[in-house]
A protein has these predicted regions:
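C-terminal charged capping/lid subdomain of soluble metabolic enzymes
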Residues: 305, 316-388
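A glycine/threonine-rich phosphate-anchoring loop and its flanking beta-alpha core
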Residues: 10, 110-210, 307
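Short glycine/serine/threonine-rich phosphate/pyrophosphate-binding segments
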Residues: 19-22, 42-46, 71-72, 96-101, ...
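Glycine/serine-rich anion-binding loops at beta->alpha junctions
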Residues: 86-102, 141-147, 277-280
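Short Gly/Thr/Asp-enriched flexible loops that form oxyanion-binding sites at enzyme active sites
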Residues: 77-78, 97-111, 149-150
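ATP/NTP phosphate-donor binding region
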Residues: 1-88, 344-345
Length: 388
């Protein structure tokens, strides 16, 4: 196991009927900005309920944060905050709203252009650059990204998606109420299942380093998502199923399962380029890329793939290579069973998409991806070709 530091200060408030706790979690004298996405949070009455729970605090609202949030939207929110004197932000929605809010709270206390903060986001925005971002909390309505309990964001600018990290943008608290997910469109639920699943495989399907606890955590999340995947789509108001989905999504990317073990992330980074170029949903791009990547990188990941086959899919017969092949096939079948196609051609994309994405990877400096830095543009081309 590798050396690691694990730090996560986010207070999780889990379960139904918890909005009244906002009155104790948000400072009494705060001037609050509620950030949210489309109109569903307003139409459902959730925003009104949150405003009521905030009591006598001054509350402003900033809506319209889009899926795959753009730098331009974040810039408008920062200008709004500086104009109105906001000092606490409450993100209401899914990962896109929370990701945008992380950049917004940094930009709100930075003297220069917000784009400078975004471009300083890897490996991490320097503390001296933004030493005091505004505090923020979240009320989650979509289980998927894990952004409610981590310090990362992904922002869209031009034809690229930019990761942004800072040790100072963990949410102060996150409210996870499974009942707030009951009215989600089916497509978003499917995407959330796949996102949670692939967040986990990115930190698990690499190579062994005797991270036994981390492996068991990951296997538990994967097995749970396989067990509940179809049911959480088909029975949206099953509280216990949605509760497990929501908690699994948070645990998949709060730093715990990746502590002390190698991490891949090539599937996500290639997927980000597909989203930026063709506006495919993030979950769809992961379903396309992961099985193809596992096929191409099978030899390098063989030991963990065989372990995955045995422990997660209960495949016990055959050589390690045979087990790996069966596990990869099972993974593809799982995504397809949710009604999510796993080939580029299913979305009207062919060889020209392969060329475009490889060029974007090169243009954005994504030339040494994967846990060993050996997913070069040539390997990415092989993966995308396999995904056709």
């Amino acid at each position: 196991m590798f050396n690691f530091d694990f730090y996560n200060p986010t207070h999780i408030v889990f379960g139904k009927d918890r909005l009244d706790k906002l009155d104790t979690l948000v400072p009494k004298d705060a001037k609050v900005l509620i950030t949210y996405g489309g109109g569903s949070a307003v139409r459902s009455g959730l925003i009104d309920r949150i405003v009521k729970a905030l009591g006598n605090r001054k509350v402003e609202q900033f809506g319209g944060i889009e899926p795959n949030p753009s730098l331009e939207t974040c810039e408008r929110a920062v200008a709004f905050i500086k104009e109105r004197g906001v000092d606490f932000v409450l993100a209401v929605g899914g990962g896109s709203v929370v990701d945008a809010t992380k950049l917004i709270v940094m930009g709100a206390t930075y003297d220069g252009p917000v784009i400078e903060v975004m471009k300083a986001g890897v490996p991490e925005v320097p503390v001296e650059m933004v030493p005091n971002p505004l505090p923020f909390g979240t009320v989650m309505t979509l289980p998927a990204t894990g952004s409610e309990m981590n310090n990362g964001a992904v922002i869209t600018y031009g034809d690229g998606k930019f990761p942004v990290f800072s040790s100072l943008v963990f949410p102060k608290f996150s409210m996870l109420d499974p009942t707030l997910t009951f009215t989600l469109p089916e497509k978003q639920v499917k995407n959330g299942i796949i996102d949670t699943f692939v967040h986990t495989t990115e930190q698990y399907l690499t190579y062994p380093v005797e991270g036994r606890i981390q492996d068991r955590f990951s296997e538990g999340i994967l097995k749970t998502m396989i067990e509940i995947g179809k049911e959480t789509v088909e029975n949206p108001e099953n509280y216990d199923i949605r509760a497990n989905h929501m908690w699994a999504s948070t645990l998949a990317l709060n730093g715990l399962i990746g502590a002390g073990v190698p991490q891949d992330w090539a599937t996500h980074l290639i997927g980000h380029e597909l989203t930026a170029a063709y506006h495919l949903d993030h979950g769809i791009t992961l379903a396309i890329v992961l099985p193809a990547l596992l096929e191409v990188k099978k030899a390098d990941k063989l030991e963990k793939l065989a372990q995955y086959a045995t422990r997660v899919w209960h495949i016990t017969e055959g050589t390690n290579e045979e087990k790996a092949d069966k596990a990869i096939a099972k993974t593809r079948e799982f995504f397809e069973s949710l009604g999510v196609s796993t080939h580029l051609k299913d979305y009207g994309l062919g060889e020209e998409a392969v060329d475009k994405i490889v060029k974007q990877l090169e243009d954005h400096g994504m030339t040494k991806l994967g846990e060993k830095g050996d997913v070069t543009p040539e390997v990415a081309r092989e993966i995308l070709t396999r995904a056709l």
